[in-house]
A protein has these predicted regions:
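A short glycine-rich, Lys/Arg-flanked "PGG" loop and its adjoining helix->strand segment in the class I
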Residues: 136-148
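A short acidic, Gly/Pro-enriched loop at the edge of an enzyme's catalytic core
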Residues: 109-120
Length: 233
């Protein structure tokens, strides 16, 4: 397990040090999640408050785009990522914008936060980049750091995705990426039963969607993700 964690850290450090994965704008599904369940922007300085959310954690934050997004709205934002390089990017960005964001290097299976210390957690493209058992342990940690009734947003690659089955199979529905900037990293594709196993007993689903994009010159390649908004039990 320790070796796998070390390999993942090295892999993601390489991705970020070479300039990949440095997104500078929030994912649209997270914007919609915020607007529907946290706060909806009405004017340049006025919001409709949906739920009493003050502290938000970006789980697997990368260079910090979602933590920055929440901090810009006046929320107390934190971000954690396995990559030291990504966290350096994130800290520099927050400093440049004059925002206070608690960015840390850390492991999603052992979150360095007190119980019930967040009102919301968001996780974009993270729990599908680890084996299923790791994703389950991370979900347990998310539930621990969320207050009862706290919000958890999560999106996951689906077994209907066009890249399903590509690469060496490391475990059921889990494959090692064979080429590109994520070469050597793990990609898990979630079946319906696996999404159920991730949330059952921990979270109540508020809404769920499948987002799909058709790619390629003939639009036959289907990029498919599950999108879940849940609340902690």
């Amino acid at each position: 397990m320790a070796q796998a964690e070390s390999d993942a850290k090295k892999g993601w450090d390489k991705v970020y040090s070479e300039g990949f994965m440095t997104m500078w704008y929030p994912n649209e599904d997270i914007i919609r999640f915020c607007s529907r369940l946290i706060r909806k922007r009405l004017t340049h300085d006025r919001y409709e408050i949906k739920r009493p959310v003050e502290r938000v954690l970006d789980l697997g934050c990368g260079n910090g785009r979602h933590a920055i997004y929440f901090a810009r709205q006046g929320l107390k934002a934190a971000g954690i990522d396995v990559s030291e390089q990504a966290i350096e990017w994130a800290k520099d960005w927050a400093l440049l914008e004059g925002l206070e964001v608690d960015f840390r290097v850390g492991d999603i299976e052992h979150l360095p936060y007190e119980d019930h210390s967040f009102d919301a957690v968001v996780s974009h493209g993270v729990l599908d980049h680890v084996p299923m058992q790791t994703a389950k342990r991370a979900a347990e940690e998310v539930q621990r750091v969320l207050r009862p009734g706290g919000l958890f947003y999560c999106d996951l690659r689906s077994t209907e995705d066009f890249e399903y089955g590509i690469g060496e199979e490391a475990a059921p529905n889990t494959f090692v990426v064979g080429e590109g900037y994520e070469k050597g990293l793990v990609q898990h594709f979630f079946s319906p039963n696996e999404t159920k196993a991730l949330f059952d007993g921990r979270f109540r689903i508020l809404y769920s969607e499948i987002t799909e994009n058709r790619l390629g010159p003939d639009f036959r390649q289907k990029y498919s993700r599950w999108v879940f908004a849940t609340e902690s039990l």
